[in-house]
Each structure stands twice: as structure tokens, then as C-alpha cells.
Amino acid sequence: MKMKRARIVDLLSTPDFNRKVCVKGWVRTRRGNKNISFIELNDGSTVHGIQIVVNVVKLGEDSLKSITTGACIAINGLLVKSKGEGQKVEIQADEIEIYGIADPSVYPLQKKWHSLEFLREIAYLRPRTNTFGCILRIRHHLAYAIHKYFNKQGFFYFHTPIITSSDAEGAGSMFQITDLDIANCPKTKDGEVDYTRDFFGCSTNLTVSGQLEGELGALALGGIYTFGPIFRAEKSNTPRHLAEFWMIEPEIAFYDINDNMDLAEDFLKYIISYAMKYCKDDIEFLNNTYNNELIEHLNFVLSNRFVRLAYSEGIRILEQSNEEFEFPIYWGIDLQSEHERYLVEKYFKCPVIMTNYPKDIKSFYMKQNDDGRTVRGMDVLFPRIGEIIGGSERESDHQKLLKRIKELNMSMDNLWWYLDTRRFGTAPHSGFGLGFERLVLFVTGMQNIRDVIPFPRTPKNAEF
């Protein structure tokens, strides 16, 4: 079979009938009788399969015995208009080659409904299902759209380190890395681990954010974005948390908080619009199968202007509502998802960008307002999931930043370089972070973040 392989998505979208084609993929189903057999073949390029019509008498019954659900095969045949119902295109097979069999007595993905919980246990095979094929194609197009958007905006893709000695969030939930012998660690005179003997000569961790290094890029290149993996050692075993995930973090010189909000809105609308254009079939499948409000939620974002809302005003609205919240409302709380969703879904009925948060619930690097109580932070709030973006105008004043670091009793040993950028040619700048899996979760309509990444890393689970 030396004919060039055709993708099923191309054969279905722009068919050129009555020509020889070669398709290769995995068998979804096979049915028929002693004279004719029908194979549904999928190659991963689309949620839709293509029907293969096999003349059993012509090709021989033995050639079909190993063609069961999950088998990988190649077909040479004639592309024709389908005579049956349910499909417009089919291939009349001339040749069949079997690459790999799938013993039906042990193959886990038989033709029946499989729960998402079961599929997480066989994450190495779940990309072959319609559901995860859709999710992974959407994930690809979202990633491509992110690069395309920032390139059009004149931003530079900036690579930040995965191994770091600093904690960008100041939260301490980091994975430590070392090549020291755990059973026989070298110690200092004080009995502490002697990290000068470690590989890097100091204590190092997997990064929780590329923001701090990204700011350095913005203060030289003007506008940058990062897009890479980050790691959080939070032992949160929930549908919203992963220990390893991907983050998009733009940082832009000469942007204030208003510029930052405008960028976030434009960015999100572009990405979601791109997905709806290029992932139409996949989104429709997920809408019809898992979440019949998915397309409605996506259009909700695209068709509405994002409301700008000060935190204090948001608290007032929540306090005066008649809602019975699980978590009480008062000025100074870190809003929960139920509060955010009320503002978006019930009160404003549009996405919300909340700003001017209490400084005590936000990170040290956010620019302080003149009131001394709040900072120029911002969160973009969406229906169903709540916060999707967190960002701020960054503190550009060296003395204010230094004072805030001291107030929080943070070590300056690993932040001296960050402070130096405020000493040498500082500039106003802003940025935000978007968890890629949170975005994929919203665009696919799934409920559990473990279902939107190929191989989820969670507490007590690092298989595959």
C-alpha cells in the first residue's frame, strides 16, 4: 500500500468522488453478513468516522477475522457517494492491511458507553474515544490560537525556567528538586540541610509561575508571553486542581490596569471565537453529549462586553442579595466560586472583571493604590467556572515593593534580581495569568479538570 494516506476529515469535508484513496486508522465498529461488511474507521483527524464497505466474497472472510473494535488497519479503495443513510461518503475497499489487532476479550474500549471515571484509569487509551479526541483537538487549536494572537499583537514568546530558586506566589506550595542522597543528606553546623552541596548549590524547586522572569522580558522587549508547564504541590484532590498544568502569562511594559483588562477581554474573545470556528464539530459533539449549555456559554462570552467592577462594589452587591451563600460575605474575603458565579450569571448576566482587591489577599508584586488598603489586581470571571484569569498592574516603585516584601516576611535572598529591575530603568507594566486547562475546561464544557489534559498529575497519581 504505497498510496499517500488521506485524512478522513479532508475526505468528508471536500470529497472528490470516484477516485482511489488510502485511509489508515482505528476500527470503531464492524458489522455485516457473509456477503458484505461495514467498517467504521476513525483516524483521529475528526470526531466523524468514515464507512468502509467490504465485499467479503471478493476479499475473503479470513481477511476480516482480526478486524475488531480497536484494530489498526489501512484501506485502499474507491471513494464514492454513500447509498445508505447516515453518511454521505464511503469507501469501497479493494485492499486491507492489518497493522495491529485488538483482542476483543481484553481490549478495554469496546462499543459501549464508558464513564469518564473509568477512562481516567486508562488514560493511555482514552485519546482514542470520541470524547477525548474532541478534547485533544480543541486543546491543540486553543494552543495554536494563543500563539497566533500574541504574534499578531507583536508580543515575543519568552521562555522562562522550570527550575527556580524563587517562589513567585509566596505560597510555599512547591515541589523541591535535589540530587542529594535523601537517606544521608549533608548537614550544616546548625543541623540544616546543606544545599551548597546540592546540584545547583542552593535550594531549588519546580516553578509555580513564570511571571517574575516574564516581567524581566517585558522590561526589555516591551511585550512578551510565556506558555509552559508549572507545578503546584497543593494536596487538593478536587475536580479543579492539578499538580502539573500549563499557564499562559503575558507581561507588557507601559500597560496600566485598564490596558491589562482590555487585553484580557480581547484575548479571551479571540481564542474562544477561534475555537468555535475551527472546532465546530468537536464542540457540537461535546454540547450534545455532556453539556447542552456549552455553546450558549461560549456565545455568552463573545456577545457581551465584560463589566468592570470594583471589589468593594462587588461585596456590596453580594451583601444586599437574597442569595444564601455557603461562605459568608464581608469586605476582605477572597471570593469563592459561588460568589463569582452569582455576579456573572445572575446579577450582571455577562462576564465580569473585578478590580481593586484588598492587598492582604493578593500577591506582593501588585501595585498598591493610594488608599493603602487595595491593589490594582484583576480577576476575569466567567459563567460556570468563576475565575479564569488573574492579573494586575505590577508594582514598579522600588521602595514600595521592598516595603511590601518586608511586611510579608519574605526572603530577599532570591528576589534581589527582581528588585533590581525597579532600580534600573523601571517602567509601569502589567500582566496576567491564564491556566490553560481552565480555558480548555470552559471551551469543552467538561466538569473535571483531569479530563482536559492528556495525563493528569494529582495527589497519589503520576501514572503514564
Curated annotation (Swiss-Prot):
Keyword Nucleotide-binding found: yes
GO terms for biological process, alphabetical: asparaginyl-tRNA aminoacylation
Origin: domain of life: Bacteria
InterPro entries to which the protein is assigned, alphabetical: Aa-tRNA-synt_II, aa-tRNA-synth_II, aa-tRNA-synth_II/BPL/LPL, Asn-tRNA-ligase, Asp/Asn-tRNA-synth_IIb, NA-bd_OB-fold, NA-bd_OB_tRNA
Molecular-function annotations in GO: asparagine-tRNA ligase activity; ATP binding; nucleic acid binding
Keywords recorded for this protein, A-Z: Aminoacyl-tRNA synthetase, ATP-binding, Cytoplasm, Ligase, Nucleotide-binding, Protein biosynthesis
The protein's Enzyme Commission number: 6.1.1.22
Protein name: Asparagine--tRNA ligase
Gene, per the UniProt record: asnS
